Amino acid sequence: QGRLGTQWAVGHLM
């Protein structure tokens, strides 16, 4: 449950 959060953050920041 750490990659999903990272992917979401990256997509939101990008």
Swiss-Prot record:
GO terms for biological process: defense response; neuropeptide signaling pathway. The modification Methionine amide is found at residue 14. The keyword Nucleus does not apply. The modification Pyrrolidone carboxylic acid is found at residue 1. Expressed by the skin glands. Keywords: Amidation, Amphibian defense peptide, Pyrrolidone carboxylic acid, Secreted. PROSITE patterns: BOMBESIN. It comes from the Eukaryota. Pfam families: Bombesin. It is found in: Secreted. One of its GO terms (cellular component) is extracellular region. InterPro entries: Bombesin (IPR000874). Signal peptide: none annotated. Its main location: secreted. Belongs to the bombesin/neuromedin-B/ranatensin family. This is Alytesin. It comes from Alytes obstetricans (Common midwife toad). The lineage of its organism: Eukaryota, Metazoa, Chordata, Craniata, Vertebrata.
